[in-house]
Amino acid sequence: MSDQATTLKIKPLGDRILVKREEEASTARGGIILPDTAKKKQDRAEVLALGTGKKDDKGQQLPFEVQVGNIVLIDKYSGQELTVEGEEYVIVQMSEVIAVLQ
């Protein structure tokens, strides 16, 4: 787990992943304020912690396709949002991760 997730003592279960969304600019370069509908449909987020993982039909542990510290792309409305000590986090399932950004 990352230092931030350890400090908060948040441990996702199963194939869930704890992420923190990156802040999206609410104004365009020219200073125009963007409404929510004009913003992207996906969010970039940093992976902070991984759950215990998922098992296949034979009981074998399946590896996660992401690692702590990866920057991933998730749907804007996916996951379960939670606020801890004034910081916003999201717990998503592995299947909700669209891509790992390189």
UniProtKB/Swiss-Prot annotation:
One of the protein's GO biological processes: chaperone cofactor-dependent protein refolding
Where it sits in the cell: the answer is: Cytoplasm
Under the heading SMART domains, the entry gives: Cpn10
| Record bears the keyword Transmembrane | no
Highest taxon of source? Bacteria
Q: Which UniProt keywords apply?
A: Chaperone, Cytoplasm, Stress response
- Report the InterPro entries cross-referenced here: Chaperonin_GroES, Chaperonin_GroES_sf, Chaprnonin_Cpn10_CS, GroES-like_sf
> What happens after mutating N70D?
In strain: L2
- Which Pfam family is an annotated match for this chain, by its short name? Cpn10
Q: Which GO terms describe its molecular function?
A: ATP binding; metal ion binding; protein folding chaperone; protein-folding chaperone binding; unfolded protein binding
Instruction: Please tell me one Gene Ontology term that the record gives under cellular component.
Output: cytoplasm
| Function of the molecule | Together with the chaperonin GroEL, plays an essential role in assisting protein folding. The GroEL-GroES system forms a nano-cage that allows encapsulation of the non-native substrate proteins and provides a physical environment optimized to promote and accelerate protein folding. GroES binds to the apical surface of the GroEL ring, thereby capping the opening of the GroEL channel.
Q: How does it assemble?
A: Heptamer of 7 subunits arranged in a ring. Interacts with the chaperonin GroEL.
- What protein family is recorded? Belongs to the GroES chaperonin family.
Name of protein:
Co-chaperonin GroES
Instruction: Please report the organism this UniProt entry assigns to the protein.
Output: Chlamydia trachomatis serovar D (strain ATCC VR-885 / DSM 19411 / UW-3/Cx)
- What's the gene? groES
